[in-house]
């Protein structure tokens, strides 16, 4: 039974409080502790939020509409005007588009199995989406620059409210993992939710960035992106993290088309590269624990052509065991999967996170790094593939389609 059908089964479509809160919270309600009472009240308010919006026709109507995805080229050429009209057009597009995409995700939460959807952490994320829909649809039509400025404030607030969504989803699924019977359904839900979130954040951040006058940028689009420079930035980050954990880190050599420059959106690389680099460095250090100050280099090769950008990350970290190879791109939230020892599957560097904010941080520590990176790459018309030589090392191939290439670009 899915969550939506159970929620609608209460008297008058209401949601019974006791099943929603679960035994643990029901027990706390009997406590005289002020803290426990506060938690129960928060859970009660959460249940009211979900209940009050489940039968709202606006969400159902918006969920039936298709999303209008833009190509980066469309965003690039619509991103400048002398009179500022591009800001109004962009804001009006967001005002129409964001509620539709968020309604699609609310529908996804409704389709989760009831026992998973009632997990307090998952329910909190569900509530965030419902509140975002409410705030966006309550905003009056954007008529002038003053309206647009207020809309920007709302967008910034929502971006901040949702910055920890990936971490929360991972936590919620790990908490309810013993109740997961259909892993394909949950993985489909995660793929759709995470890639939709990426698209929403790219569109929203692009609009906010249109207000900035930054050299070589139109919104979030860099007109002369250097893959070598962005790789170097995340190499420095991953090496610091690795040195903190192991006392040393592999050196990194970059070769190939190191002088390449082209229009591209850095944001997806800012999500994906830290995960791939941390994996390579951890695997290298874990396979050379006897000689931590004499470890092989990680080698990164850049290949640029008129269709796509390819980044190969090669490590000598011992490769991936045959038994793990088929599962390494899966989300790992079940008990059996949590026990694996492969560095690419187990939590990455524990919960040690030197990079806060909404970039790579949310993927850390839950075995979500590779599958999330794979989902992002596919959403952007590319791919993420592994070639492993067990006993030697692993090559990771990241392919991302150009936004101005010979073939049609991806849509956001």
Swiss-Prot record:
**Per the database record, which ranges form the Histidine kinase domain?**
159-404
Q: Where does Mg(2+) bind?
A: 279
Q: Which Pfam families match?
A: BCDHK_Adom3, HATPase_c
Main EC class the enzyme belongs to: transferase
Identify the main location. mitochondrion
Acetylation as a keyword?
Answer: yes
Cite the record's note on assembly: Homodimer. Homotetramer. Dimerizes through interaction of two opposing nucleotide-binding domains. Interacts with E2 component of the branched-chain alpha-ketoacid dehydrogenase (BCKDH) complex. Competes with BCKDK for binding to the E2 component; this interaction is modulated by branched-chain alpha-keto acids. At steady state, BCKDH holoenzyme contains BCKDK and BCKDHA is phosphorylated. In response to high levels of branched-chain alpha-keto acids, the inhibitory BCKDK is replaced by activating PPM1K leading to BCKDHA dephosphorylation and BCAA degradation.
The name this protein goes by in its record: Branched-chain alpha-ketoacid dehydrogenase kinase
Q: Which organism is it from?
A: Homo sapiens
């Amino acid at each position: 039974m899915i969550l939506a059908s159970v929620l609608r089964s209460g008297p008058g479509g209401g949601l019974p409080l006791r099943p929603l809160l679960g035994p643990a919270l029901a027990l706390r309600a009997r406590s005289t502790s002020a803290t426990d009472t506060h938690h129960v009240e928060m859970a009660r308010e959460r249940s009211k939020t979900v209940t009050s919006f489940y039968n709202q026709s606006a969400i159902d109507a918006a969920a039936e509409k298709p999303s209008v995805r833009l190509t980066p080229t469309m965003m690039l050429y619509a991103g400048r005007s002398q009179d500022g009209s591009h800001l109004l057009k962009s804001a009006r597009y967001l005002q129409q588009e964001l509620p539709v995409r968020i309604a699609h995700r609310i529908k996804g939460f409704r389709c989760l199995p009831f026992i998973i959807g009632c997990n307090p952490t998952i329910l909190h994320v569900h509530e965030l989406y419902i509140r975002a829909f409410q705030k966006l649809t309550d905003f009056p039509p954007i008529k002038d620059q003053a309206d647009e400025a207020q809309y920007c404030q709302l967008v910034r607030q929502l971006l901040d409210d949702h910055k920890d969504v990936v971490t929360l989803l991972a936590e919620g699924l790990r908490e309810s993992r013993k109740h997961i019977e259909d892993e394909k359904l949950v993985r489909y839900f995660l793929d759709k939710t995470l890639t939709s979130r990426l698209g929403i954040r790219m569109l929203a951040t692009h609009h906010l960035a249109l207000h900035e006058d930054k050299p070589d940028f139109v919104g979030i689009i860099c007109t002369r992106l250097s893959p070598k420079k962005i790789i170097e930035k995340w190499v420095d980050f991953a090496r610091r993290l690795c040195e903190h954990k192991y006392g040393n880190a592999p050196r990194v050599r970059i070769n190939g088309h190191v002088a390449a420059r082209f229009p591209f959106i850095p944001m997806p690389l800012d999500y994906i590269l830290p995960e791939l680099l941390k994996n390579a460095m951890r695997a290298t250090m874990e396979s050379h624990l006897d000689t931590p100050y004499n470890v092989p280099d990680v080698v990164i090769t850049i290949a640029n052509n008129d269709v796509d950008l390819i980044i190969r990350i090669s490590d000598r970290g011992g490769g991936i065991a045959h038994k793990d190879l088929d599962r390494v791109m899966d989300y790992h939230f079940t008990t059996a999967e949590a026990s694996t020892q492969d560095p690419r599957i187990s939590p990455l560097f524990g919960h040690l996170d030197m990079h806060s904010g909404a970039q790579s941080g949310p993927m850390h520590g839950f075995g979500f790094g590779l599958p999330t990176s794979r989902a992002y790459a596919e959403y952007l018309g590319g791919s993420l593939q592994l070639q492993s030589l067990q006993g030697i090392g692993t090559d990771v191939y990241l392919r991302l389609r150009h936004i101005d290439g010979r073939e049609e670009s991806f849509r956001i």
